[in-house]
């Protein structure tokens, strides 16, 4: 497989895999343009489809972790006809090569405890590749890491991520433009909540400093209900209404 590194100079003409076109793609691309200056790398297959890795120096990651000297993987996604050909391994190998070249301690990434969850990495794949759990959030989301330096201090969640909670009742959503699907679905859920009289508050995170102190281990999409973390899975309006009815 041939790969392309999406950079500031070519992003306007290249697709970004998870959003091929439309306004949701533009929102994601604008977010990426700002992150490139902070060291973000977006590396994808030359073939059209969902096959890419996105990572950034952990100091600039939009998640509440203490991981100075590490690379943080925002997303590693291979699906559809491109799945099952070893491309995930190739993408990860490129990230590790880059980490070594930069003299990083290693790489880290979020996953669910024990099983694959939507919008999180597969823990079985990571374990097979040598990753270990460095920290665990109360909501069952783990921080996994693969060290390149034996003496490196493992990355950790900040307390706000390790013990996720909010004070408000009803539904509270924190989200960013890191995932293009939020651009489409968050307004749909807001509208559905309003129509059905469901208390719902959406907080759009637009700054790194805010993201690094969100009361959840994920910031791309973190939904709370009556103070408790519910899911990192981006909800459609129908899925949200079903959840609200439970």
Per-region residue spans from a language model:
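Short amphipathic alpha-helix that is part of the acyltransferase structural core
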Residues: 1-48, 159-161, 169, 181, ...
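Conserved GNAT acetyl-CoA-binding A-motif
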Residues: 99-117
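A conserved beta-turn-beta hairpin within the catalytic core of GNAT-like acetyltransferases
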Residues: 61-73, 83
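Conserved acetyl-CoA-binding loop-helix of GNAT-fold acetyltransferases
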Residues: 78, 84-100
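Non-catalytic, surface beta->alpha helical segment in thiol-disulfide oxidoreductase systems
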Residues: 226-246
């Amino acid at each position: 497989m041939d790969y392309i590194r999406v950079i500031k100079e070519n992003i306007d003409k290249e697709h970004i895999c998870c959003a091929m076109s439309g306004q949701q793609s533009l929102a994601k691309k604008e977010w990426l343009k700002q992150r490139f200056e902070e060291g973000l790398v977006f590396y994808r297959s030359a073939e059209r489809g969902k096959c890419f890795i996105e990572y950034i120096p952990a100091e600039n990651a939009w998640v509440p972790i203490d991981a100075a000297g590490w690379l943080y993987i925002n997303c590693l996604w291979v699906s559809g006809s491109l799945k099952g050909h070893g491309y995930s391994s190739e993408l990860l190998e490129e990230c590790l090569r880059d980490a070594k070249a930069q003299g990083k301690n290693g790489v880290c990434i979020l996953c669910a405890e024990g099983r694959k969850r939507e919008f999180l990495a597969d823990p079985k794949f990571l374990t097979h590749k040598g990753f270990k759990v460095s920290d665990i959030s109360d909501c069952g989301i783990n921080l996994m890491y693969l060290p390149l330096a034996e003496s490196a201090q493992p990355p950790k969640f900040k307390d706000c991520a390790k013990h996720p909670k909010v004070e408000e009742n009803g539904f509270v959503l924190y989200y960013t433009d890191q995932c293009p699907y939020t651009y489409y679905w968050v307004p749909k859920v807001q509208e559905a909540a309003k129509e059905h009289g469901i208390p719902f508050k959406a907080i759009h995170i637009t700054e790194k400093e805010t993201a690094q102190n969100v009361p959840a281990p994920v910031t791309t999409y973190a939904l709370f209900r009556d103070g408790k973390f519910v899911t990192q899975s981006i909800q459609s309006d129908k899925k949200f209404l079903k959840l609200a009815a439970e």
